Amino acid sequence: MTKLYIQDVTLRDGMHAVRHRITPDDVGTIVAALDAAGVDAIEVAHGDGLAGGSLNYGPGSNTDWEWIEAAADNLTHATLTTLLLPGIGTIAELEQAHKLGVRSIRIATHCTEADVSAQHIAKARELGMDVSGFLMMSHMTPAENLAEQAKLMESYGAHCVYVTDSGGRLTMNGVRDRVRAYRDILDPGTQIGIHAHENLSLSVANSVVAVEEGVTRVDASLAGHGAGAGNCPIEAFIAVANLHDWQHGSDLFALQDAADDLVRPLQDRPVRVDRETLTLGYAGVYSSFLRHAETASKNYGIDVRTILQEVGKRGLVGGQEDMITDIALDLVASGPVSTY
């Protein structure tokens, strides 16, 4: 089979788990460990991508540029990657990231809004970058519709398009259906990627199913460090890949050491499946909403799960973090709310 392309997202999606607060020194140390462990690419940015630091999404302890520079200084083999959401990051941020050594970028949109990625994908291609389309909250639209959005990103110039399970809501059949729908419509030369979350404890299983269906790019992170219950834990996925004799180039023990020695000590809240993060997956809520919902719960005395259930019912998507407070206030005003 084709060698897998292992992309680590500890220092981008994982930013949500530490409220986007990490020192450049820690970034450099983690990047050096990942590079030595043989991963193919390392993504670095605010959790919401370039220029994501704000009152709405959460300010970062440092700028994207400070983190990216620290990463670039510690890379030898892996490709430096970042993420950009059109409407948050701009062409100017894309160009600056390229100047600092970023050579691969994922352009992320909501799963039904691929058309807003055209400019950014085209610019990244113009700069000679490796470009992926990143269709977030992929559970929110049927497989065939998602594949049509992937086809748009391909037409703009994306080398790869991801099934991005931002809510950790997809089951194995959901992943299988979406990857097959992609393969049916995309050109044979266009790669497919999987970005899984652990909210339903299915991130490794979903990633394995994706690979079995032809996916070659797999997102994962040290200790699963990421939004909600975290991403696919890279050390667990690599262990399973070894059992399947899949080619990948990563060192299992080195990844285990980095996960336990470097990343877990940074977590102010354990990244795991618990009553709150399981509810994210069950209700199909954007994983990065967890910390915002926990803050609203503390401020207004409403169970986090009740808030998350209502977020899921209303179908909130990335960028609507401010509405979580509105939901909490509505719940306070309406009195006791039953759970399901």
Curated annotation (Swiss-Prot):
<dbReference type="GO" id="GO:0009098">
    <property type="term" value="P:L-leucine biosynthetic process"/>
</dbReference>
<protein>
    <recommendedName>
        <fullName>4-hydroxy-2-oxovalerate aldolase 1</fullName>
        <ecNumber>4.1.3.39</ecNumber>
    </recommendedName>
</protein>
<feature type="active site" description="Proton acceptor">
    <location>
        <position position="16"/>
    </location>
</feature>
<feature type="domain" description="Pyruvate carboxyltransferase">
    <location>
        <begin position="4"/>
        <end position="256"/>
    </location>
</feature>
<keyword id="KW-0464">Manganese</keyword>
<dbReference type="InterPro" id="IPR050073">
    <property type="entry name" value="2-IPM_HCS-like"/>
</dbReference>
<feature type="binding site">
    <location>
        <position position="286"/>
    </location>
    <ligand>
        <name>substrate</name>
    </ligand>
</feature>
<feature type="binding site">
    <location>
        <position position="166"/>
    </location>
    <ligand>
        <name>substrate</name>
    </ligand>
</feature>
<feature type="binding site">
    <location>
        <position position="13"/>
    </location>
    <ligand>
        <name>Mn(2+)</name>
    </ligand>
</feature>
<dbReference type="GO" id="GO:0009056">
    <property type="term" value="P:catabolic process"/>
</dbReference>
<feature type="binding site">
    <location>
        <position position="195"/>
    </location>
    <ligand>
        <name>substrate</name>
    </ligand>
</feature>
<dbReference type="InterPro" id="IPR012425">
    <property type="entry name" value="DmpG_comm"/>
</dbReference>
<feature type="binding site">
    <location>
        <begin position="12"/>
        <end position="13"/>
    </location>
    <ligand>
        <name>substrate</name>
    </ligand>
</feature>
<keyword id="KW-0456">Lyase</keyword>
<dbReference type="GO" id="GO:0030145">
    <property type="term" value="F:manganese ion binding"/>
</dbReference>
<dbReference type="GO" id="GO:0008701">
    <property type="term" value="F:4-hydroxy-2-oxovalerate aldolase activity"/>
</dbReference>
<dbReference type="Pfam" id="PF00682">
    <property type="entry name" value="HMGL-like"/>
</dbReference>
<keyword id="KW-0058">Aromatic hydrocarbons catabolism</keyword>
<feature type="site" description="Transition state stabilizer">
    <location>
        <position position="12"/>
    </location>
</feature>
<dbReference type="GO" id="GO:0003852">
    <property type="term" value="F:2-isopropylmalate synthase activity"/>
</dbReference>
<feature type="binding site">
    <location>
        <position position="195"/>
    </location>
    <ligand>
        <name>Mn(2+)</name>
    </ligand>
</feature>
<keyword id="KW-0479">Metal-binding</keyword>
<dbReference type="InterPro" id="IPR035685">
    <property type="entry name" value="DRE_TIM_HOA"/>
</dbReference>
<comment type="similarity">
    <text>Belongs to the 4-hydroxy-2-oxovalerate aldolase family.</text>
</comment>
<feature type="binding site">
    <location>
        <position position="197"/>
    </location>
    <ligand>
        <name>Mn(2+)</name>
    </ligand>
</feature>
<dbReference type="InterPro" id="IPR013785">
    <property type="entry name" value="Aldolase_TIM"/>
</dbReference>
<dbReference type="InterPro" id="IPR017629">
    <property type="entry name" value="4OH_2_O-val_aldolase"/>
</dbReference>
<dbReference type="Pfam" id="PF07836">
    <property type="entry name" value="DmpG_comm"/>
</dbReference>
<dbReference type="InterPro" id="IPR000891">
    <property type="entry name" value="PYR_CT"/>
</dbReference>
